[in-house]
Amino acid sequence: MPSMDIVSEVNEVELRNAVDNTRRELDSRFDFRGVESEVSYKDHQVTLSSESDFQCQQMVDMLRNQLSKRNVDPASMDVAEKAIHSGKTFSLKVTFKEGIDSLVAKKLVKLIKDSKLKVQAAIQGDSIRVTGKKRDDLQAVMAIARESDLGQPFQFNNFRD
């Protein structure tokens, strides 16, 4: 029986490349000349710091743009609500969602079961295993997962016939 896993992962190499490209763009942009701004990456967390809150928001847009160029879904970004002000700099933390938490997994399994396809979906830690009799059913599940608006991008791996 064909099976596959639904996961939510961020390619760390592409994420680091996007952060480096954002840093390069920051150095070359005219509106950031003479402004102390910094982009740093550590443990799936990007820290954007600049002299004003508005510039931090511009840096978030620059990072989103670079992520989409590197084929990393910007929907996996979790931007802090407010920039932290300390001294003369504002810092904004951006974390990236890894794995499917249990609430989202339950909603996705419910969507799959409500579709009346002949597949079984089982939650396995931070991924969902889907098995079915036909490959077409699994492809329909892939379409359902892509169309679902659960605030998280999904990838599909371990596709077995």
From Swiss-Prot:
Q: What does this protein do?
A: Nucleotide-binding protein.
Do you know which CDD domains this protein is assigned to?
YajQ_like
GO terms, molecular function: nucleotide binding
For this protein, the record's Pfam families field holds: DUF520
- Native species of this protein? Shewanella loihica (strain ATCC BAA-1088 / PV-4)
Annotated Gene3D superfamilies: 3.30.70.860, YajQ-like, domain 2
A single GO cellular-component term from the record reads: cytosol
Q: Describe the family membership recorded for this protein in Swiss-Prot or TrEMBL.
A: Belongs to the YajQ family.
**Which NCBIfam families does the entry mention?**
PRK05412.1 (NF003819)
What is the protein name given in its UniProt record?
A: Nucleotide-binding protein Shew_2893
Task: Give the domain of life.
Answer: Bacteria
Keywords annotated in UniProt: Nucleotide-binding
